[in-house]
Amino acid sequence: MPQIEKDYIDTGKMKYVFMDFPLPMHGQAMKASEAALCAGDQNKFWEMHDRLFANQNALSPEALSKHAEALGLDTTQFKECLESGKHAAQIKAAMAEGQKAGITGTPGFLLGFVEADGKVKATKKISGAVPYANFKTTIDELLSSKK
């Protein structure tokens, strides 16, 4: 991702939108996604996201609280958010959108354009952890087709 950010996002050639897609086979993935969004309520989404990915064996409710504490979050607010399921509908909507676009696993990437109505029209899909060169080829093809 860092090279894509440098070459395409930071230069304004493309925009990056992250959508949660917790897989049902991972029993704690949904709560982990909610935890990242609850951390986002306190402006720490990416910090929590990265921490959870780095600690995938520590996703129990107790571990999520410890992650929140380590990030300096207001733990009372974080726990209330997590227990309320405040972000569950948002995550389920993102999953439905991803499934509709053909995403079946993670990581999954949709590349496309923003239409006049503000909706993203995905024209290419990349599945799995692939090398930067694959992204570069696909992105460059899309960008040149839009000229």
Please identify what each model-predicted range represents.
Residues M1-E69, D74:
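Structural alpha/beta surface segment adjacent to cysteine/selenocysteine redox centers
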